Amino acid sequence: MPGLKLSAVVPCYNEREGMQELHRRLDLVCQACVGDSYERVLANDGSKDATWQTMRELSVSDKHVVAIDLSRNYGHRLTLSAGLQMCRGERVFILDADLQDPPELLPQMTARMDDGCDVVFGQRIKREGEIAFKKASAYVFIGYSTEWSTSKSRPTRVISD
């Protein structure tokens, strides 16, 4: 599918249980945003369950699904990188397979790009139901490093909805 408007890249590890729900929800959102001009790149990170088999079945039955199988568990970052190397869309949406962050936010994110933003990413402001250690570690490992790397060298425009 040359000239795709959108690629959704999804690293997956032991996600067989939720794969059908991810497929259903992401398909609806992508269709609503760009019609038929999209792909969903699912990258398997050496899962021990039937994630790869489910991904392969989806890629056979749905022309929008591209399935990648890594030979072993390389970790989230390298799996994401493999997915990014395979995607062909003008815009790329990165989503974890566990659906902790809803794919239904994609229309809001693409609207921000339509408004002129080159890069749009989401970050939860309120983390309900998580213990203090998880909140603190999320800030230290994600929030602080993002804050440090982006605020020092790049102009940012924060938009909160």
What is the role of each PLM region?
Residues 57, 66-72, 76-86, 91, ...:
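Acceptor/aglycone-binding surface of glycosyltransferases and processive sugar-polymer synthases
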Residues 30-36, 58-64:
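Short helix-capping segments at alpha-helix termini
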Residues 1-28:
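N-proximal low-complexity "stem/linker" segments adjacent to membrane-targeting elements
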Residues 10, 23, 27, 34-46, ...:
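Short beta-strand/loop segment that forms part of the nucleotide-sugar
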Residues 17-21, 49-58:
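Acidic helix N-cap motif at the loop->helix transition within catalytic regions
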Residues 44-52, 99-100:
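A conserved acidic beta->alpha catalytic loop
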